[in-house]
Every structure is written in structure tokens, then in C-alpha cells.
Amino acid sequence: MKQLNRLIGKQGEDMAADLLRKKGYQILDQNNSTKWGELDLIVVKNNVLIFVEVKLKTTEDYGTPEEMIGKNKLAQVKKTAEMYLLNNPDIAKKFDRYQIDAVCIVEESERITHYENLTF
């Protein structure tokens, strides 16, 4: 089951990366795992470093992918992003600022939505 979840997660990250590339984003890293958490995608556009949370659901029968990104999830992504920046000062100093985005995907309806600069 764990391996299947990883495979599904990778599929979602790949779909999100493709969408963002088409929108002019540069992909710096994918599936960056640390002891503080995982950053699905790290991308850049207009000198902004962006940490992207990706949520993929096969259907919306039991809720939307957006419902999976609440206050606690955003706080975890923010903390992981801050630790990433502390541990990568050369990367951190290259950019004007950073933000958190999300890409939500529903396979059944082929819906893929990019939410920019999330706050909580």
C-alpha cells in the first residue's frame, strides 16, 4: 500500500510539474524529502522561489483534493520550506521571496487547478 501511494504521489507530481513547465515555471526539485517533511515540487518564476504542494485524487466521491490542504498542512509545508531555506542559504539568497502554491488534480474529470501564493 505504501508503495502504491508513493507511485500515485509521483504521478501527481509529474502531472503538476508538466502543467507548471507549460506556464513558464522552472522546476528546481521534485519530491524533496527531509526529516521535517516532504516538499512535492520546488519551482521558480519571476525570481520567486515557490514550494508546491500537490494533491491528487482519482475521484471526488469522498471530497476534493482542495479539502486535503488545510491550515495544518500549510503550516507543515511552510515549516519544511523554512528549514529547506535555512539548510540551503545559497539558494535562499538568490530569490526575492518565497511562497507556497498548490496543484490539485482529479483524474476522473481530468481537472487540474493551480492555486498561487496560499496563506493561512
Stretches with model-predicted labels:
Residues 13, 38-40, 53, 73, ...:
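Acidic active-site catalytic centers that drive phospho-/nucleotidyl reactions
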Residues 1-30:
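Acidic-basic catalytic patches of nuclease active cores, encompassing PD-(D/E)XK
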Residues 26-49:
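Active-site metal-binding core of divalent-cation-utilizing nuclease and nuclease-like domains
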Residues 87-120:
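Domain-level recognition of nuclease-like catalytic cores that cleave nucleotide substrates
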Residues 41-61, 77:
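Conserved catalytic cores of phosphodiester-cleaving nucleases, focusing on short active-site segments
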Residues 62-92:
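Mid-chain, well-packed structural core segment of small domains
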